Amino acid sequence: MSMGAQEPRNIFLLCRNCGISFEDLRLCCVFCTKQLTVAELTAFALRELNLVWKAGVPYGACARCLLLQGIARRLKYWQYSYYVEGVEEETKESINTQQIRCYTCHKPLVKEEKDRHRNERRRLHKISGYWRGCCAYCWTRCTVRIPQ
């Protein structure tokens, strides 16, 4: 499936360039080599993640490995945290114009999720040189209270 010098960066371009439908696409995880399920392929595409090419073969990432990589990266490469105002001061631009991903699931944050960080005074984290926050799904998942 090697595409040469013009290797597609995402699943949709890969399907188009190879002339296959999304439903027929089969990718393995770059970390564990397990074949991705349809749900994992869909999540990978919706999170706007890039394919990894090794020896001319494209790879994605399964849900389990994405979660584990997010945790490992946060623990190993966390640099510092700022409130939104601090991030905007450091970068000299609004967070609404910046690409900020969820540190757990890697989905790009939309305006409402960025606004929530500002309004609820939640910090953004500099991890591996990139600003990361928490998407609405992971925010809810991380703040659910277990009844006693």
From Swiss-Prot:
GO biological process: DNA-templated transcription; regulation of DNA-templated transcription; symbiont-mediated perturbation of host apoptosis; symbiont-mediated perturbation of host ubiquitin-like protein modification; symbiont-mediated suppression of host innate immune response; symbiont-mediated suppression of host type I interferon-mediated signaling pathway
Secretion signal, residue range per the UniProt entry: none
Zinc finger (unnamed): 29-65, 102-138
Record GO terms (molecular function): DNA binding; zinc ion binding
Intracellular or extracellular location(s): Host cytoplasm; Host nucleus
Alphabetical list of Gene3D superfamilies matching this protein: E6 early regulatory protein
Cross-referenced HAMAP family: HPV_E6
Function per UniProt: Plays a major role in the induction and maintenance of cellular transformation. E6 associates with host UBE3A/E6-AP ubiquitin-protein ligase and modulates its activity. Sequesters tumor suppressor TP53 in the host cytoplasm and modulates its activity by interacting with host EP300 that results in the reduction of TP53 acetylation and activation. In turn, apoptosis induced by DNA damage is inhibited. E6 also protects host keratinocytes from apoptosis by mediating the degradation of host BAK1. May also inhibit host immune response.
Binding partners and assembly: Forms homodimers. Interacts with ubiquitin-protein ligase UBE3A/E6-AP; this interaction stimulates UBE3A ubiquitin activity. Interacts with host TP53 and EP300; this interaction inhibits TP53 activity.
Record protein name field: Protein E6
Naturally occurring in which organism (per UniProt): Human papillomavirus type 94
